Regions:
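Transmembrane helical bundles of ABC transporter permease domains
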Residues: 3-13
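ATPase nucleotide-binding head domains, primarily ABC-like/P-loop NTPase cores
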Residues: 13, 18-230
Length: 230
């Protein structure tokens, strides 16, 4: 294991070692990039979580960069926690247990649907929080396996429960209603977005994180571009 960490550091001399915070929770980073993306295409972004509870809600259009941002944060956080250098200009983190819901899958063998598997994952997170465990949570488009009304109601309830349990983390979503939670919890929730811009009938992405709730959606535009009548 030590040889692997040493080899990783040797192969990435431009990476830096993070500073370790001693108070739950803190993660502040500048110019974080995904280690698996080529340098010439890697767009870097910042993160700032200074206290508990605190959640970043990331909204945005399809392909705008939400999931890549979550993976960038998660990979660098894990690298920093195990003693490896990170792809960033600077990073300070508190080494809590990281829990994610990024690639939940169903199971025919266990007779378990995608939705039920996701519920089990979310229940595990709530249980650990209620037991007093310190977690850093990363969620990507939760409750995809149900209808939009049920999904919105469940997502809002989950976010309120996470805040009540002093949780910290990031959630990416297409549901703009979640962004309204910042008004209810201005000291615990912050909105950020990735935008898709349409110029001259072409879709462009900056992949740069911006403050606020997403303004542009692109699903219908992409359907039309693919020749599907909308």
């Amino acid at each position: 294991a030590y040889c692997s960490l040493g080899g990783f550091a040797f192969n990435h001399p431009e990476y830096i070692y993070p500073e370790i915070a001693d108070v739950y929770f803190k993660m502040e980073g500048k110019a974080l990039g995904h280690p698996l993306l080529r340098r010439d295409i890697c767009v870097k972004n910042d993160i700032e979580i200074r206290k508990s509870p605190w959640f970043l809600i990331i909204t945005g259009a399809n392909m705008a960069g939400k999931s890549t941002y979550l993976r960038t944060i998660g990979v660098n956080y894990l690298l920093g926690c195990i003693g490896a250098p990170v792809c960033a200009a600077s990073l300070t983190l508190y080494p809590a247990r990281m829990v994610t819901s990024l690639r939940t899958s169903d199971s025919l063998a266990s007779n378990e649907s995608y939705f039920f598997a996701e519920l089990k994952r979310l229940k595990m997170i709530i249980d650990r929080l209620q037991q007093g465990e310190q977690l850093f949570i990363i969620l990507d488009e939760i409750l995809k396996g149900t209808n939009s009304i049920d999904k919105q109601k469940g997502s809002l309830a989950l976010m309120k429960q996470l805040v009540a349990n002093q949780a910290c983390g990031i959630i990416a979503t297409h549901d703009l209603a979640l962004g309204e939670l910042e008004k209810e919890f201005p000291n615990q929730i912050k909105n950020y977005r990735f935008e898709a811009d349409i110029q001259d009938n072409e879709l462009t992405f900056s992949y740069q994180l911006r403050e606020g709730i997403a303004q542009n959606m692109n699903a219908c535009f992409l359907m039309k571009k693919m020749g599907i009548t909308v």
